[in-house]
Each structure stands twice: as structure tokens, then as C-alpha cells.
């Protein structure tokens, strides 16, 4: 299909913990497409989404959902059954990438360096630490750092963790515990078959959690990151390799920790996000700008890939 004009249904919102982020992403995408002359149907995801899509009859669906069910293969399967073309990754890739443990199983055998970890259930935390402190607890299938905590010796969760501790992970049953990797937080966006740039995330206080990601002023984005050329290239190579191994489509974003005292050996891939944010503060649009691509062009590029 040509560059349009297209009729694009933008799926956003939903009921995951990342609903508000998705609404911001969806609004940005829809506004950008309309500014380029495309017809847009905005759909706040609900249980009647299939009926609403059937009525709209779009040329393509822009999936701006984050979390379950828009990022775990559920929506992708529905769109496949309905015969709609859609942006970003397909069913199988989404099922694997949303699950941090499955992602490790898919990538580590191919030489992608990732932290060792162990699966735990939240109840077991009250009797024994799963790893030596400090360690990171994260839900297996949430994004945007929802439910993530760093458990340190001096944390207020208790030792062992107390049932009265108000840890952000408590609403989740399946957790992944990983060693805490000291150092710097970096991320690489991949668009199509190109790694765009490396961004360093410098948090004013604490760590790069949900609030730090989506509250203006809490995190400084340094793009391109001030890191050695070989480190930047290694991260871009790993992000592109992970994108290809998982079968990602459209845009993805790979998050890294880098222990800068150990050079290339200190680079660890944390996760691959197949539905990266498209808010004004989001990293993929920022990296696109760094390589000369404005927001509306980025959105059109993602839609074009879905239509080819």
C-alpha cells in the first residue's frame, strides 16, 4: 500500500497497570497521523473491541497498548483472526517477550548477556531471600517498571521481608529475582532493521521506576549516551540481535545495565520491550529525533512496515 492516506485504528488504554501510559501513547500517535492527513479511529480498548474494529474497517491497526492484553499476544491473536494488519510484533514474539523468563530462554543460548535469575512466588519471600542482597524483584510480565523493587540490606522491607512490607510487587504472584547490577541504565531503540541510538537514563533519585519514567523532570535523558564507542556499538549490536532473534516487527526497545568498571563485559541486557512507549517523554521518539526523524515520520514508518 502507498503512503496513504490510510485509515488507521489506534488501540490504546485498556485495563493493564500501564493504561495511562497507553492513553498518552495513543493520543500522540493519533494526533501525528491526523496531522499527516490520515483518517484515524481512536479506540479505548474494552471487551467490545472486536466489534468496534469490525465496524471501523481500518486499513491497519496501530497497537499503542502496553501490558496485558495488548502486549502479551492476546490482542495480536484477535487481530490475526480478524484479518487486520497491525503494527509491532506478532503473536508468538509478544508471548515470549512479555515473559522475562521466556525471553532469557530465547536469548541467552545465542550469546546475549543477561543477568542470572530465579523465579519465585511472592509468598516465599516472607521466609527467605531468593538471592543475596542486593537483588531486584520484578513481575514476570509487566512493563514500565511496574511492581519493580530493589531489595537492599538497609531497605525498609525487613530481613527477611515482612508481611507488613508495602513492596510494589505484592499484587503479583509470579516474580523474577535477579542480582542487582551496579552501574548505569541505558537503552537502545530498534526500528525495522536499524538500531537507532543509545540513551543513558540518569535518575535524580532512587531508580528508574514508573514515576521516574513518566514524570517530567525526574530523569535526565542523555542521547547519545556519553559512553565509549565500543560500548555504544556493542549495545546497538545486542539490541538488533535480540530484535531479530525474537522476531520483533516495527519498533522495539532493549534496556541495559552497564557496570562501567568492567568494560564490554559489564553490559547486560535486561529486557526487550515490543510495545515501547510513544509518549512525549518516551525513548523511541527521542532516539528517532537524534537520527533526524521527527515524531510524525516515525509513526508513519511504523505503520508502513505493518502494511508491507
From Swiss-Prot:
Positions bound to Mg(2+) 2: 271, 273
E.C. code: 6.3.2.4
GO BP field: cell wall organization; peptidoglycan biosynthetic process; regulation of cell shape
Cofactor(s) in the UniProt record: Mg(2+); Mn(2+)
Cofactor mode of binding and number, as noted: Binds 2 magnesium or manganese ions per subunit.
InterPro entries for the chain: ATP-grasp, ATP_grasp_subdomain_1, D-Ala_lig_Van_CS, D_ala_D_ala, Dala_Dala_lig_C, Dala_Dala_lig_N, PreATP-grasp_dom_sf
Source taxon at top rank: Bacteria
Binding residues for Mg(2+) 1: 255, 271
Residues that hold ATP according to the record: 131-187
Subcellular location(s) per record: Cytoplasm
Catalytic activity entry: 2 D-alanine + ATP = D-alanyl-D-alanine + ADP + phosphate + H(+)
GO MF annotation, one: ATP binding
Pathway: Cell wall biogenesis; peptidoglycan biosynthesis
An annotated GO cellular component: cytoplasm
HAMAP family on file: Dala_Dala_lig
Biological function: Cell wall formation.
Family: Belongs to the D-alanine--D-alanine ligase family.
Listed name of the protein: D-alanine--D-alanine ligase
Organism from which the protein derives: Sphingopyxis alaskensis (strain DSM 13593 / LMG 18877 / RB2256) (Sphingomonas alaskensis)
